[in-house]
Amino acid sequence: MRPIVKWDPQKEESIKEEYHKYGEAKPDLCRNLGTICSYCEKTFQDDRDLHVEHIQPKKYKDANGNYIYAHLETVWSNFLLSCSTCNGPDNKGNKNVILGKCHLPHLNNTFLSLCYKAGGVVEVNPALNGDSAANAHNLLQLIGLNKGPKDSSLKDKRWLIRSEKWDIAQRYLDKYRNRRTDVDTIIDLAKGYGCWSIWFSVFKGYDEVRKALIEQFPGTAKDCFDAANHYEPINRNPDNLNDPV
């Protein structure tokens, strides 16, 4: 999952700390992060297909029936972009999100949290342990990103999309190795097809491609990757001893 940096309302004049209606934040989110689902990384030509997603759901009710996040309904810091599947009732929906107990793409290096493989497989990074592994697992469960063909609804084709995009990326890796395509073409394909993490995974060892993927996708958290080590992911929160990811 692509780690992202959201614009700071204190530094970007066009960004409001709070909006009159949360839907008014969508153009700003799209300029900041691209017309891309912040979770499954599907790309959209039309931003009408994207939701302004409330990280802590506005309709979540606690045991006493209180909407404990209602005050965050129009607050910029509580927004990401999501497709209807990731934000749907079968996946994130109105699940409770406790900050610090679940990795999130604007707070953690979520490319380090998860591993992408052929066949549409997404798993918790086996190199993680302790709270880091638990919080990465919570992210996977929150979005339902690990659902495969046996446990996905007929409408949830995210695993199939990933599988298809993995195969496409592999084909273009072979072409790139044989100098039958170039970096610009790879980036154009990644932007058109989506699934940033798959392209970044498949092109491991090709620094010029990885560099372009980081730089040419708006909002990508550049500090989450080590340019001196083939743009491998690094901890985003090194001072957090319990969960540096």
Where are the regions that the model predicts?
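Short helix-capping and hinge/turn segments at secondary-structure transitions, especially at repeat
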Residues: 88-91, 119, 171-174, 178
